[in-house]
Amino acid sequence: MILYEYPFNERIRTLLRLEDLFDRLEYFLGQDHAQQHHVALTTLFEIIDVAGRADLKTDLIKELERQRQALAPLRANPQIDQDALDSVIGEIEQGIAMLNQTVGKAGQLLTDNEWLTSIRSRAIIPGGTCEFDLPAYYAWQHRPAEDRRADILKWARPLVSLRMGTTIVLRLLREAGQSGKVIATGGSYQQMLSGRSYQLMQVYLDDSLLAFIPEMSANKYMLWVRFTQQDGDLRPRSVDADIPFLLKLCNF
């Protein structure tokens, strides 16, 4: 199955972007080539930009605390797997503790690093990190892969709590959803929300339907899913076929 997700609000949109960036950072950090570590470092800069919202840490703590309070009464329910419940609550409490220990804005230690700041300011310029622009960075790229990886891990360490909080919140949100099989008649599907509010829409497509690309949108009254295909130049074109898919709407 191929999963497409659509956030209903800016907060979830930010968390999805952070999740994508953290995954990219982890992948390229696990490689050994200097160019791959360059991508890892520029991805770290992107994470700082996205996470720079002053209230992001507060939002995560509040949401985790709300989830902990919602789950705590279930400890009195004999039909609930208490070991699994304790594991989830323990993970939430660990996430809250780590976020509370984070001082200042996300990535503040990186922005205070003059050498990293110089690289960051040049990285936004096309071709701006050549050896004649940043000879010290060029020299760093010729260090052993293990040394470069250790440096990036050290620089990324202040963001570990942010990643953990993001991961927990998104996992809990994705698990709190209702799903059903629907059909996009003539390539289009719409559904009234009947006053209910959601935070995330998921569209699951069978692998055999890879050629069909869902374009999703929503407001507080209705959601739409419209499928397109790409022509030889990869430009989108409308679809007239009936397309089955699994729709899941998630909300805490």
From Swiss-Prot:
Keywords: Cell cycle, Cell division, Cytoplasm, Septation. InterPro entries: ZapD, ZapD_C, ZapD_sf. It comes from the Bacteria. The keyword Nucleotide-binding does not apply. One of its GO terms (biological process) is division septum assembly. HAMAP family: ZapD. This is Cell division protein ZapD. The gene is zapD.
